[in-house]
Swiss-Prot record:
Disulfide cysteine pairs (residue numbers): none
Basic and acidic residues: compositionally biased ranges: 7-18
TM segment ranges: none
Protein name: Protein LKAAEAR1
Region described as Disordered: spans on this chain: 1-45
């Protein structure tokens, strides 16, 4: 004898509240007896139209945390225990957000990015050319000095490279002080010039 229909209180599994997840119409197909070929989409899965209708902050939040909102039941039916690859993936949000932009605006933005990159390249080339010409000019000045001492002095005060590599000092502070005092000592009436 079949159990009597439940009145008022609890409803059966197929008679639960008439609410279904937005964007899914598979609940009615199952009630009519048609077998479901696809697993039901989770409640957080939106269509591109639903995503476009959201406020920007809501859309951003949904795209960031949408995969955390899965129902346990939907997850169990969507991801069977034996499968390694999930049956349903969160669609890539990039085409939805990019499709909201008009093609002309997108082309203008891309053109601006390309022009800025080209300008940066030109500025970099000019800077490199200037430093190379400066280094060549200083090297020529150093070569044309009358004495080696003058050439070394000029090279110290005008390095060919703008940022010469610093050679680390092998002496510590105490040793450096000792070397300076030795250089300034009187030896045979002559002072070593510093």
């Amino acid at each position: 004898m079949p159990p009597p229909a439940k009145e008022g209180g609890r409803k059966g599994p197929r008679e639960r509240s008439g609410k279904s997840a937005p964007g899914t119409a598979q609940g009615e197909e199952r009630a009519k007896g048609a077998p479901a070929t696809e697993p039901p989409k989770p409640g957080w899965a939106l269509t591109p139209q639903g995503l476009a209708a959201m406020l920007p902050a809501q859309r951003h939040r949904h795209l960031l945390f949408g995969d955390l909102l899965e129902d346990v039941g939907a997850a169990a039916s969507t991801f069977p225990c034996g499968s390694v690859e999930p049956g349903y993936r969160m669609p890539d949000p990039r085409p939805w957000t990019q499709s909201l932009e008009l093609p002309a605006e997108r082309q203008n933005r891309l053109l601006g990015v390309l022009k800025a990159a080209e300008a940066r390249g030109r500025v970099r080339a000019l800077r490199l050319r200037y430093t190379r010409m400066r280094a060549e000019e200083i090297a020529l000045l150093i070569q044309r000095q009358k004495s080696a001492r003058a050439a070394i002095r000029l090279e110290l005060f005008l390095p060919p490279q703008l940022k010469p590599a610093r050679i680390p000092d092998p002496l510590d502070r105490q040793e450096r002080r000792r070397v300076e005092t030795i250089l300034e000592e009187n030896v045979d009436g002559t002072i070593f010039p510093r």
